[in-house]
């Protein structure tokens, strides 16, 4: 949802949330653009809905980004802009808690920026960053990538 105050980072379990991920043209929320947004809506541990859309960033996708996310200019040439896609994602998420890995340090910055840019308000949803939780649960680990967690839990 949109409003004047950003949502808070939470660390407690919530049964209902929207797990999401962004792919972008680079790592800077100042200069780079979203090229894909994907999400699942979870209710009591079960996926009940999905959202996924490629986004045309309005400029070429750098090779470095394409080599990481495997999204090419050809794939997004007929896609809509993030200005058109973002309202649909916001409607999908509603006022649910947002969740994802490293979203506090990355994904949320893009959402905050673009909500301000397109709507003049910020994203008010609370969020859970699984990277922050992994740091609390596994302080001795050198790395806490999503793949490390998946391997640890046999996923």
Give names to the regions the model predicted.
Residues 2-125, 139-155:
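Conserved non-catalytic scaffold segment of RNase H-like nuclease domains
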Residues 124-134:
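A short, structured active-site edge motif that brings together acidic residues
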């Amino acid at each position: 949802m949109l409003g004047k105050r950003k949502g808070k980072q939470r660390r407690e379990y919530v049964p209902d949330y929207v797990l999401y991920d962004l792919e972008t043209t680079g790592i800077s929320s100042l200069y780079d653009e979203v090229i894909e947004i994907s999400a699942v809506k979870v209710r009591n541990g079960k996926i009940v809905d999905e959202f996924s859309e490629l986004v045309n960033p309005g400029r070429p996708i750098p090779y470095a980004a394409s080599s990481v996310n495997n999204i090419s200019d050809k794939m997004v040439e007929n896609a809509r802009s993030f200005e058109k896609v973002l309202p649909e994602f916001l409607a999908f998420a509603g006022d649910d808690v947002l969740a994802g890995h490293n979203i506090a340090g990355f994904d949320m910055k893009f959402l905050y920026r673009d909500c301000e840019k397109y709507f003049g308000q910020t994203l008010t949803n609370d969020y859970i960053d699984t990277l922050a939780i992994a740091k609390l649960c596994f302080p001795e680990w050198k790395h806490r990538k999503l793949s490390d967690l998946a391997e640890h839990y046999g996923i």
